């Protein structure tokens, strides 16, 4: 089925191109004798480039399809590539040793977007799923069971959708007649509620799908936990490089690196000399794709790369308040309802 928004099974899959590859390699400085962790293996673009540059790699992905697809690469570069299934927030347990570099490409992969049966994209008719790890609560569970007020928080805070309340109320009314089963079911309702003009730059369902996906996979919480884990794993001089695709992710990374690259705030009850020293050097200038890359890979247009070098000072305290992002706590607060 093809809806008026352009989603449908006949859409042509986009090529799986690693975003900002040259810039990521320049930041990470891969070389023989270095051990780098790729926290989001996906189709293996970063991992292959790191291996070809001489580095050894530990690659992680929570998607079993990505792990299965990476086995030929692991065989090609054995024993220099270790491929493990898991969340990137679990990198400490998986790596088990200190690292020279860490790269994270945050969010859903092109591979997942292009598989209709995974239910990530309103452009491809499929089950309303969105689970990166293919287990746990699905997007359909959330849409069909959560109260309108909770759905509005998900769409508004995580999707940054200004019509969140109207959409949530329409969902609550619509599911009383027929449950939402497919990506098309939801995308068509959103389009009916808020409309779609030819001049709109994005499909009206874009932000609703973003909010649902982030909630189902606890993407912001995963990112925050991964940043804390990364500073504990990196050797002095090691590089953290993070590619983000929307403002919430980028804000979390930006605030983390800002907080960790200056004298860290301590309790007012402690003496001034007890203030912790910077965990990272001043972050490198953020990078976005150029016109040539976005022309070849339109999905790269919203990408941002932020990177910083680890100092020799001890890792800081794991305090989620330093991010100052209310959306970070939505999944934690509503998560019990999804179980």
UniProtKB/Swiss-Prot annotation:
According to UniProt, the name of this protein is Ribosomal RNA small subunit methyltransferase H
* Coiled-coil zones: none
Q: What is the role of the protein in this entry?
A: Specifically methylates the N4 position of cytidine in position 1402 (C1402) of 16S rRNA.
Gene Ontology cellular-component annotations: cytoplasm
Enzyme kind, highest EC tier: transferase
Q: Which PANTHER family match?
A: 12S RRNA N4-METHYLCYTIDINE METHYLTRANSFERASE, S-ADENOSYL-METHYLTRANSFERASE MRAW
Q: Where does S-adenosyl-L-methionine bind?
A: 44-46, 61, 88, 105, 112
The record's subcellular location field reads: Cytoplasm
Q: Which reaction does it catalyse?
A: cytidine(1402) in 16S rRNA + S-adenosyl-L-methionine = N(4)-methylcytidine(1402) in 16S rRNA + S-adenosyl-L-homocysteine + H(+)
Question: Which GO molecular-function terms appear in the entry?
Answer: rRNA (cytosine-N4-)-methyltransferase activity
Keyword tags: Cytoplasm, Methyltransferase, rRNA processing, S-adenosyl-L-methionine, Transferase
Q: Does the keyword Transport apply?
A: no
